[in-house]
Amino acid sequence: MLPARNRMTRSTEFDATVKHGTRMAQPDIVVHLRRGSEPDDESAGPRVGLVVGKAVGTAVQRHRVARRLRHVARPLLGELQPSDRLVIRALPGSRTVSSARLAQELQRCLRRMPAGSGR
């Protein structure tokens, strides 16, 4: 589970991260990262948001995918800068893959992001 201070909850945060952040795709997830987006909000630490649409499956399947994504995102909080905003969008294939593969894809995305990610 992600701590409350590290969760994105406002749609404006999601919109800004998706619109102005850098996108990296993998077979089962798409990651949007916006670095240094809100300098006055750094004390809260990095924030992570999930997008798991109906294309992923039934409500039970979507919630399962969301739980697994939260679980794999939590250890990566230490690698992010305090002002970073991260949105993870689950693709339909994420419903059938293992948590280990989701973690591997997320780590691969974050490693390949340019240092100054964000527009």
Curated annotation (Swiss-Prot):
* The keyword RNA-binding is annotated on this UniProt entry: yes
**So what does this thing catalyse?**
Endonucleolytic cleavage of RNA, removing 5'-extranucleotides from tRNA precursor
Report the EC code(s) recorded for this entry: 3.1.26.5
Q: Which residues form the signal peptide?
A: none
The Gene Ontology biological process terms listed for this entry are: tRNA 5'-leader removal
Q: Which Gene3D superfamilies match?
A: 3.30.230.10
What are the UniProt keywords, alphabetically? Endonuclease, Hydrolase, Nuclease, RNA-binding, tRNA processing
SUPFAM superfamilies according to UniProt: Ribosomal protein S5 domain 2-like
What Gene Ontology terms describe what this protein does at the molecular function level?
3'-tRNA processing endoribonuclease activity; ribonuclease P activity; tRNA binding
Classification via Pfam families: Ribonuclease_P
Is the keyword tRNA processing assigned to this protein?
yes
Cellular component (GO) terms are: ribonuclease P complex
Q: Which PROSITE patterns match?
A: RIBONUCLEASE_P (PS00648)
Provide the top EC class: hydrolase
Quaternary structure annotation from Swiss-Prot or TrEMBL: Consists of a catalytic RNA component (M1 or rnpB) and a protein subunit.
Function per UniProt: RNaseP catalyzes the removal of the 5'-leader sequence from pre-tRNA to produce the mature 5'-terminus. It can also cleave other RNA substrates such as 4.5S RNA. The protein component plays an auxiliary but essential role in vivo by binding to the 5'-leader sequence and broadening the substrate specificity of the ribozyme.
Which family does the UniProt entry place this protein in? Answer: Belongs to the RnpA family.
Q: What is this protein called?
A: Ribonuclease P protein component
Q: Which organism is it from?
A: Mycolicibacterium paratuberculosis (strain ATCC BAA-968 / K-10)
Per UniProt, what is the name of the gene that codes for the protein in this document?
Answer: rnpA
